[in-house]
Amino acid sequence: MRIHIVGSGPTGMSIAWELLKTKEHEVIIYDRKKNAGGSWWEPEGNKRDIHAHRIVFGNAYRNTNDLFNQMGISWNEMFEPVDSRVYTTILKYLNPKDYAALSSLAVRVLSNQNKYKSITLKDAIGELSETGKSAISTLTLIMDGVTWDIMSAYEFVKSFDHVGLSKQYTQRVSGKIMSDKMKKELVKKGAIFKFNAELINVEYGKDEYVGIFEDGSRINDGMLIMAIDNGKAINLVKNNWGEDIQKKIGPSTYGCINILFDYDEEIYLQKTDLEYAMETEFKIQPVVLSDRKTVSCVICDLTEEILTTDPDTLKTKVFEQLNVPKPLDIRIGWGCNWENGKLIHSGLQSSQ
């Protein structure tokens, strides 16, 4: 069977690999960008230009480790440990009342998982101390880029294991390195990549579909898999999943802005990203990138104030809130566009 996969991010390429292993399918992968990577994609250039830095968990990512082994990719070549100290930071802010609330939540979630998949962490966790509330409500931003009134209690309990029991890593050099290696191995397996190809509409029949790309080309055979972010998926899935599509996948969609600080010498942050997120008005999550001279400052909680702040003012406010040494340059990562003084695109992602 011919299988069309729209989206060449890690998800789309992982699906393609599993399908190609069967040796029963022709796999074609499409992406609107110039190369593979999805939200991990980075443009060419001397400076890092990323949508957002990524935190991954070594012991928890068993499927990724297995996939890398099959592809001949070394985990340690792709990722390097980060000094985030998130777990010790959490412990500093919790008291016995908070431990009791977390323990109760874990028992309730694990004994009735389906129920708590539809209840937010904020509604399920119960009473917390002021410091515990600040830590837990901010931790969800570090875990998955969403606030605690969006993350489900089930997702929090399962994800908390990753944070507490697994060493944290970020991209070594850049996410482009991983994307290029995965693409190379897929091509060896027979995958066909088509870039600068944006799917803009899907028409659904009873047992058929027509996918329409921006250049007017169409696909209508075999199977269509959309490995794309939820924000884009909502417009393409339409009512094919029922009338409540917005309710099903809308809440797990988030955007982010990444402000990049460039230095001419190595920089060290005095606090963890969790502490900065707890203490700054914009809940900024800063991490020093692998070159040790670039700080990636991600903002996921996009309030109306942030959305209506012009780029130059936003850069100034982020610098002032972090209280770090003055950088040589302050840039905004790809995926953000402003129109009439308001952010109109912030690189929509999925938290699932």
Indicate residue ranges for each PLM-predicted region.
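N-terminal Rossmann-like FAD-binding beta1-loop-alpha1 element of flavoenzymes
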Residues: R2-I29
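Conserved Rossmann-like nucleotide-cofactor binding loop
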Residues: T11, N35, G231
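Glycine-rich FAD pyrophosphate-binding loop
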Residues: L20-E44
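N-terminal glycine-rich dinucleotide-binding loop that anchors FAD/FMN and/or NAD(P) in oxidoreductases
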Residues: E42-D66
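Mobile amphipathic helical/loop "lid" adjacent to a hydrophobic cofactor/ligand pocket
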Residues: G58-A153, G164
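Helical element adjacent to the flavin cofactor pocket in flavoenzyme catalytic cores
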Residues: K158-F213
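Mid-domain catalytic core of redox enzymes
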Residues: I200-I306
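Conserved flavin/dinucleotide-binding core of flavoenzymes
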Residues: E281-Q352
